[in-house]
A protein has these predicted regions:
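Acetyl-CoA-dependent GNAT
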Residues: 2-5, 10-78, 83-85, 102-109
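Conserved acetyl-CoA pyrophosphate-binding loop and the N-cap/start of the following alpha-helix
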Residues: 86, 90-98
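Active-site acidic-Proline motif in GNAT/NAT acetyltransferases
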Residues: 83-89, 120-121
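Conserved beta-strand-loop-alpha-helix junction that forms the acyl-donor binding cleft
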Residues: 113-121
């Protein structure tokens, strides 16, 4: 999945440590969980979710996880973040477009509903 030089790559044993180095700008920690927590959730919900690194060329600049809620049914976009050093350049919008394109393939089930989540505190 690539648009311009931004792409989504599945988080695997080969790249998960890169996600641990991502940082939010000051004050943003209240709106999104760090990838460490998200990857723990991805393990628990592994049959209904897919975590991705957001890459600019070959450098991870962000993280997003897609999870399918079988009860509703709907797709949720969890923990989307762009590293503080890459914010303000339009990469988040491109990554969101790529994430929605992935969801449209209906990897876990059928639904036309997508929710983008964030912490409200």
């Amino acid at each position: 999945m690539e648009k311009y030089n931004i792409s989504l790559r599945q988080i695997t044993e080969d790249n998960f440590m890169e996600a641990f180095h991502l940082k939010l700008a000051n004050g943003q920690e209240h709106f999104v969980s760090h990838p460490i927590r998200s990857l723990a959730q991805a393990y628990v919900y592994r049959n209904q979710c897919q975590p991705f690194g957001i890459y600019k060329d070959d450098t991870m600049i962000g993280y997003v996880m897609v999870i399918y809620d079988y009860d509703i049914p709907e797709y949720d976009i969890w923990h989307m973040m762009i590293d503080e050093s890459n914010q303000g350049q339009g990469y988040g919008g491109i990554a969101l477009d790529l994430t929605i394109a992935y969801i449209k393939t209906k990897p876990f089930g059928t639904s036309d509903k997508v929710t983008l989540t964030c912490h409200t505190d």
